[in-house]
Amino acid sequence: MLIRADGAGGTKEFTKWLTGRRVAYSVGFTLPMDTPDFYHLVPEWVWVPALNSDGEAREGADLADFTGLLDLDGWPAGMRVIVRRERPHPGAQLRFDDVDGYRLTAFATNTTLGTLQQLELRHRRRARCEDRIRIAKDTGLANLPLHGFDQNRIWCQIVALASELQAWSAMLALAGH
């Protein structure tokens, strides 16, 4: 079983809990403030291209394993931290924590098999779940429009059904995409 989570799941307590249950995980990881120092220690040849969902190299996005550079005291043994660097898209707002023009994001995993590219692609696929949540909110889950609890409970079921219909129709109609 694999548990995937965004940055909210990247805590010592949660990863220890998952490790104690012998569950594989891939969770967002908050990089420390001194990340630029670590970034500059990584030679250019260490970075490998990130992949698109179709398995092709994504231009301008690279991956490196920062596990040996970070202080991971208190984190579960065997945890790896994989960093993705990517140039922000044209027009994107730059952030204070961008390093040398790259936006750095990271995730932690206890999976030992697979390339950095495979692990990062697997982690990024959690975005489908986040997309389904966004669709559910757009479909009507963002607000409960009725006054009674039972009425809103029925409303939530209707929204869930509509979200399922949207997901299935997209999978069936756009199977090759």
Language model features by range: what are they?
Residues 12-14, 138, 172:
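Short, function-defining helix-loop hinge/capping sites that tune catalysis or transport
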Residues 119-167:
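Short amphipathic alpha-helical "interface-anchor" segments enriched in bulky aromatics
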Residues 24-137:
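An anionic, glycine-rich sequence signature occurring as long contiguous blocks
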Residues 1-9:
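Acidic/histidine-rich, metal-coordinating catalytic segments
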Residues 15-24:
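Short, surface-exposed basic-aromatic patches at helix termini and helix-loop junctions that form
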Residues 165-177:
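A short, flexible helix-boundary coil/loop motif
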Residues 11-16, 36-40:
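A short acidic (Asp/Glu
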